[in-house]
């Protein structure tokens, strides 16, 4: 277990971000190419070299497919090149765990993964999906490495930290949102995020940026003790 320290010169030690919503117009993230470019330029100024953007895939709300995502990625990368922004852009996806996703897994649908076959998943915030363990097992059986997005935000995990330990024991990687260290989402999310850092249970940090307003909050988050503490962990961001 790590001890909390005081940092006199807070900095952004990350060069790779693994969670954002920067492909315009396909989910609840940025709405225009212009907004995407502004945010990406700011990421570059913060020292990022690579962004792995992860649009939502939720059947009844954001029915994105690998084809749709690939096309949007191609278009945005072309704009980045025009602006000469020195940053690499890749895309995965953020899959919502529900019966539709389970069906896709059973049908062998190709997924949007990143890095060494990592797949980012999310759940509803209130209750643990009854088939979450089945989804995790199926993904792992298919050769994917499961990454749970922002576990600190789920109420069912805030109420039972043992559930988080169980997820780790099952081979799930945990991705914490930097904004959680500021209390942006809730006090309970901040508390769990700090617990996960304290107990060295975090594998990835992500920005989960949806818009310029959140980017401003992110700049404050990198100064938080929780974020700086995470810099002492063996995070997998830099390996991507």
Q: Which sequence ranges carry the predicted segments?
A:
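Extended substrate/RNA-proximal surfaces in nucleic-acid metabolism proteins
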Residues: 2, 63-173
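Non-catalytic positions within long, well-ordered alpha-helices that form the structural scaffold/packing
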Residues: 44, 140, 197-198
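Active-site environment of divalent metal-dependent phosphoester hydrolases
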Residues: 58-61, 96-98, 153-157, 181-184, ...
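Hydrophobic faces of well-ordered beta-strands that scaffold small-molecule active sites
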Residues: 16-20, 51-53, 89-93, 119-121, ...
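Short acidic/histidine-rich active-site segments
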Residues: 202-218
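Mid-to-C-terminal alpha-helical segments outside catalytic/metal-binding sites
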Residues: 2-4, 219-240
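His/Asp/Glu-enriched short active-site or ligand-binding loop at hydrolase and phosphoryl-transfer sites
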Residues: 171-183
């Amino acid at each position: 277990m790590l001890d909390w320290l005081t940092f006199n010169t807070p900095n952004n030690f990350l060069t790779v971000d693994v969670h954002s919503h920067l492909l315009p117009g396909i989910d609840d993230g940025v709405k225009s190419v212009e907004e995407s470019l502004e945010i990406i330029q700011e990421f570059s100024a913060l020292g990022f070299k690579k962004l792995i953007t992860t649009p939502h895939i939720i059947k009844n709300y954001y029915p994105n497919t690998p084809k749709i995502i690939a096309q949007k990625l191609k278009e945005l990368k072309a704009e980045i090149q025009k602006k000469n922004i020195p940053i690499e852009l890749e895309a995965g996806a953020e899959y919502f765990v529900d019966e539709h996703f389970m069906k896709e897994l059973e049908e062998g649908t190709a997924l949007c993964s990143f890095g060494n076959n990592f797949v980012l998943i999310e759940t509803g915030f209130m209750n643990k999906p009854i088939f979450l363990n089945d989804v995790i097992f199926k993904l792992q059986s298919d050769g994917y490495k499961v990454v749970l997005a922002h576990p600190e935000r789920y109420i069912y995990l805030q109420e039972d930290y043992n559930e988080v330990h169980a997820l780790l024991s099952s081979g799930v990687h945990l991705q914490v949102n930097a904004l959680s260290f500021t209390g942006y989402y809730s006090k309970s999310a901040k508390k769990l995020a700090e617990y996960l850092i304290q107990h060295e249970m975090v594998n990835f940090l992500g920005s989960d940026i949806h818009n310029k307003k959140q980017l401003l909050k992110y700049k404050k988050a990198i100064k938080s003790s929780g974020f700086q503490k995470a810099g002492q962990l063996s995070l997998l961001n830099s390996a991507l």
